[in-house]
Swiss-Prot record:
Belongs to the herpesviridae ICP22 family. This is Transcriptional regulator ICP22 homolog. The keyword Cell membrane does not apply. Transmembrane segments: none annotated. Residues 178-194, 204-224 have a biased composition (Acidic residues). Residues 11-33, 261-273 have a biased composition (Low complexity). The lineage of its organism: Viruses, Duplodnaviria, Heunggongvirae, Peploviricota, Herviviricetes. Pfam families: Herpes_IE68. It comes from Equine herpesvirus 4 (strain 1942). Keywords: Early protein. Coiled coil: none annotated.
Length: 273
């Protein structure tokens, strides 16, 4: 009978070894639901010289231990798109954000942005180097072996036919992305909080001793001097206006009211009250 030859450059797998690769389109393959520990190394991996993105070719023997355990055991050649699996994986991440994140809305936006960024990088041929892949996915060199083998297998295909994928045929029953849209969850991020706190001026005893005008307050003065409110008059913009924010002035007034009267001195009106 006729013998059907495999496509040039495509990795061939043993017929008795299941594959981690999902089927094309929206319908998952029965093999795609198998556990990762049942995945085995393809019988032949694409050859070729050293490449900036996935490095030197890997032998099946060196790749085998990393396909079933460790942080890098999330992919294996050959790869095919599976919309159902992708929708389920993204929904699991939304579930983690909705149940444990402090900034739910912000983190859900980050997840959507990451998905778009990786698609856009591939579409625009902005290909990460091997070191960049390891930094982005936080993988050690030995943990990135399955990723390297998968990328080499993808790039060994002669060409890919452009097509549009349909929505998942089996979407998750509970969409946790909808639960991430929490009203009022627009709190600033940690970076914004850190930058905002740097502008707050704290009162210190040195500032109090250096400001002699704090000791000359009386009831005849304007209330704005004691309440810490800024005045719009031009006279206040000169010597009477403190160099620190108004909250510092209010704290100084509170501390001054609780001080004991010096010996031989006459207490102020505010202290006598």
């Amino acid at each position: 009978g006729s013998c059907r030859m495999s496509q040039r450059g495509a990795p061939s797998t043993s017929p008795i070894i299941p594959s981690l690769s999902p089927s094309s389109g929206g319908n998952p393959s029965p093999r795609s639901s198998q556990r990762i520990d049942s995945v085995r190394v393809p019988a032949r991996l694409p050859g070729g010289s050293d490449h900036p993105e996935y490095g030197l070719p890997l032998s099946p023997r060196s790749l085998r231990p990393y396909l079933s355990r460790g942080p890098g055991a999330f992919c294996a050649p050959p790869w095919r798109p599976d919309v159902n699996r992708l929708a389920g994986d993204v929904n699991r991440l939304f579930r983690g954000i909705s149940t444990s994140s402090i900034h739910v809305t912000e983190d859900s936006r980050v997840l959507r942005r990451v998905l778009l960024d990786f698609y856009a990088m591939g579409y625009t041929h902005a290909r990460p180097t091997l070191e960049c892949w390891q930094a982005l996915l936080q993988l050690m060199p030995e943990q990135s072996l399955p990723l390297r083998a998968t990328l080499r297998a993808i790039n060994s295909e002669d060409k890919y036919e452009q097509r549009f994928l349909d929505p998942p045929s089996k979407p998750p029953k509970t969409l946790f992305g909808e639960e991430c849209e929490v009203s009022g969850d627009e709190s600033p991020s940690e970076e914004e909080e850190a930058s905002g706190n740097s502008t707050i001026s704290e009162f210190s005893p040195e500032e109090e001793s250096a400001s002699s005008d704090f000791e000359s307050f009386s009831d005849e003065e304007d209330d704005s001097c004691c309440t810490g409110k800024w005045s719009s008059s031009e006279s206040d913009s000169e010597a009477d206006v403190p160099t620190n924010p108004p909250t510092t002035r209010a704290r100084a007034a509170q501390k001054r009211r609780g001080r004991p009267v010096p010996k031989g001195g006459r207490p102020a009106k505010s202290a006598r009250r």
